[in-house]
Curated annotation (Swiss-Prot):
Entry-linked HAMAP family: GlgC (MF_00624)
PANTHER family per the UniProt record, alphabetical: GLUCOSE-1-PHOSPHATE ADENYLYLTRANSFERASE, GLUCOSE-1-PHOSPHATE ADENYLYLTRANSFERASE-RELATED
Protein name from the UniProt record: Glucose-1-phosphate adenylyltransferase
Record's function text: Involved in the biosynthesis of ADP-glucose, a building block required for the elongation reactions to produce glycogen. Catalyzes the reaction between ATP and alpha-D-glucose 1-phosphate (G1P) to produce pyrophosphate and ADP-Glc.
Family annotation (NCBIfam families): glgC, PRK00725.1, PRK00844.1
EC number(s) given by UniProt: 2.7.7.27
Pathway, per record: Glycan biosynthesis; glycogen biosynthesis
SUBUNIT field: Homotetramer.
Family the UniProt entry places it in: Belongs to the bacterial/plant glucose-1-phosphate adenylyltransferase family.
KW Nucleotidyltransferase (keyword) present: yes
Length: 417
């Protein structure tokens, strides 16, 4: 991968993840207790041998920038020409903010050119999966492709969420349609499925640059790889598909777009099963992150009716389950669940404090929230809608606004990420 430059797109507003993205960029949202969403893609880069990466940021990037600086910039060898660097919009070639995925790469065309890569690997910072990009690169080189895009098989009913790829049994891409309502296309590898783009592309640099320059001059373009770049390249360039190979090495392929609150909730709760498909404990494919120093988690009190327990849960360092019960949950660092409280099927971000005699289920609790004694969340949807954000499937999201108004003295709302 020494000839390859990674460009990781992390500038999306994450509107479908609101209110979790009200104060942070989507790739900076917590995942799996101790991680940020962007850690998954960055770990794939490092594990694949890709050690030159630009991260393109834009919206509410303070906590994301800090996380990258503190946790990732130091693990590559600068003296070897390796780097993981953040590139905010610099308006060097345009007066606009990033207007689309292709425009984001175009606006950093000078930074890309300065590294003189032979190949550019374009990635998204908000998906959950394990993938060895080097395998994709080998196919790209062996096939003599100008562009290779990673694909995964999906049900035809899901096409409105994906770029649909017309691919033959030799992996040639003969068509690309972004998020069609329906399609008659079927994958040659499984006639009941459709080949869909994963938003992962390898371009020869000498192909990418002129294509971006041409797109930038088109006033009718959305400046997006899926909507504009790839459909226009079909038939003119050699485009191949790479079938996703999951480094989890389980029977089912695991790739999740956590772009909605329900999808985000489900992906986190996947982790608490006995043998989750997405394996955080694989030493051969470690998931890295930046961790602050906390004491070990502990579970205290063993009295009748007051026993500190956590069952089928991910519990991070610094957590104290003090006479409460936690079931089927993901707890980020420094969470406290106090006596006689029950927390079920929920995600609690860092520094959440659950008071006594609380009952919480199917909820996402943002960081620094203090839940007052006796509070009930997740049991009455209509009541919850009056105070919190509730998804169509009934997941309740409690943000820091709740603590700001309910308990302004005990919570520092302005604590940094």
């Amino acid at each position: 991968m020494i000839e390859t430059l990674g460009v990781l797109l992390a500038g999306g507003a994450g509107e479908r993840l609101y209110p979790l993205t009200r104060d942070r960029a989507k790739p900076a949202v917590n995942f799996g207790g101790i991680y940020r969403i962007i850690d998954i893609t960055l770990s794939n880069c490092i594990n694949s041998g890709l050690r030159r990466v630009y991260i393109l940021t834009q919206y509410k990037a303070l906590s994301l920038n800090r996380h990258i600086r503190e946790g990732w910039s130091g693990i590559v060898g600068n003296e070897l020409g390796e780097f993981i660097e953040i590139l905010p919009p610099m308006k060097r070639v345009s007066e606009n903010w990033y207007m689309g995925t292709a425009d984001a790469v175009y606006q950093n065309i000078y930074s890309i050119g300065s590294e003189q890569p032979r190949y550019v690997l374009i990635l998204s910072g908000d998906h959950i999966y394990k993938m060895n990009y080097d395998l994709m690169m080998r196919q790209h080189k062996d096939s003599g492709a100008d562009v290779t895009l990673a694909t995964i098989l999906i049900d035809p009913s899901e096409t409105r969420h994906f770029g649909v790829v017309d691919v033959d049994n030799q992996s040639h891409v003969n068509g690309f349609v972004e998020k069609p309502k329906s399609t008659e296309l079927r994958s040659p590898y499984d006639p009941s499925k459709v080949s869909a783009s994963m938003g992962i592309y390898i371009f020869n640099t000498d192909v990418l640059i002129p294509v971006l320059l041409k797109d930038a001059e088109d006033p009718n373009s959305k400046h997006d790889f899926g909507h504009n770049i790839l459909p226009k390249m079909v038939g003119e360039y050699k485009i191949y598909s790479f079938n996703f190979i999951d480094e989890n090495k389980k029977e089912a392929l695991y790739w999740r777009d956590v772009g909605t609150l329900d999808a985000y909730y489900d992906a986190n709760l996947d982790l608490v099963s006995v043998a989750p498909v997405f394996n955080l404990y694989d030493k051969a494919w470690p998931i890295r992150t930046h961790q602050r120093q906390y004491p070990p988690a502990k579970f205290v009190f063993a009295e009748q009716g007051r026993m500190g327990t956590a069952l089928d849960s991910v519990v991070s360092m610094g957590c104290i389950v003090s006479g409460g019960t936690v079931r089927n949950c993901v707890l980020s660092p420094d969470v406290r669940v106090n006596s006689f409280s029950e927390v079920d099927s929920s995600i609690l971000f860092s520094h959440v404090n659950v008071g006594r005699h609380c009952r919480i289920r199917r909820s996402i609790i943002d960081r620094d929230v203090h839940i007052p004694e006796g509070t009930v969340i997740g049991y009455d949807t209509e009541s919850d809608r009056q105070k919190y954000h509730v998804t169509d499937s009934g997941i309740t999201v409690v943000t820091r606004d709740y603590s700001l108004f309910e308990n302004p003295v005990e919570v520092d709302y302005f604590t940094s990420e």
